[in-house]
């Protein structure tokens, strides 16, 4: 089974709140680890979950408000002290490179590993990163500083070989058959690919919408996403405050999920004024029942499917 799993490390907003850390998440795609935002205390949360820092391949920073990146410098330094040698790429707003350089210079630190900052795109749908596991595209969010969400979409898998037909396929042709080729036998008989293979699982998708005002223009990009994380800083009682600060209410997050036909909605970035997430959760579930309030230290698995589910 190929893993596609989200670990929530922090669910709080800007001000400290008992029991909540600032925003950070870890996405595991086929055992490759991608860190999404890095608020204060991220290292501690990673340690609690038994995550080896050195396995983190890339870091994605949505914007430069402190609750989303102030844990980054400590993590970079810890990787240095732990002997990291493999390159680390950080996708982030342009000013982050200068911030990191100033802090490294002030502490007299010369990293043992290559560190590269790649600037986030401005437009939704623009490519951020592609590897053999996942394709990442940008989501243009609406906030007080340049802010980018991220859509992680699994790369398509090959077709599977039918157990009752695999014996007729020569070893050297099996990869081609998995890619969709028909099989021609020695006597000239052509076996259609559909008789030899099973449909591959559908590519899975996770969307991360951090700090943003209500942005229905995101819906086309989010269409059919399996798991949507959307900030829900306030309830509708404070909709005016949400507009002023360019944040979202739980109801607005749920509306985005409903219109996008998302599989599940995960709420986060809870204001410290809410001692419990229940008011936010109840507000969202009234619009989109498949809503959960993100729990720190909890893993959310997106299972493989071979057909589209009608919710």
Stretch-by-stretch model annotation:
Residues 1-49, 85-87, 150-152, 159, ...:
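Conserved beta-strand hairpin/beta-sheet module of binuclear metal-dependent hydrolase folds
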Residues 6, 37, 46, 63, ...:
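Divalent metal-coordination and catalytic microenvironments
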Residues 11-13, 41, 64, 95, ...:
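Active-site metal-binding loops of divalent metal-dependent hydrolases
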Residues 16, 129-221, 227:
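Active-site-proximal loop/helix segment associated with metal-binding centers of metalloenzymes
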Residues 40-91, 119-121:
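Active-site metal-binding motif and surrounding structural segment of the metallo-beta-lactamase
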Residues 84-88, 93-121:
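Active-site neighborhood of divalent metal-dependent phosphoester bond hydrolases
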Residues 126-138, 304-311:
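Short, surface-exposed amphipathic charged segments that create phosphate/polyanion-binding patches used
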Residues 179-301:
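Cap/insert and terminal regions of metallo-dependent hydrolase folds
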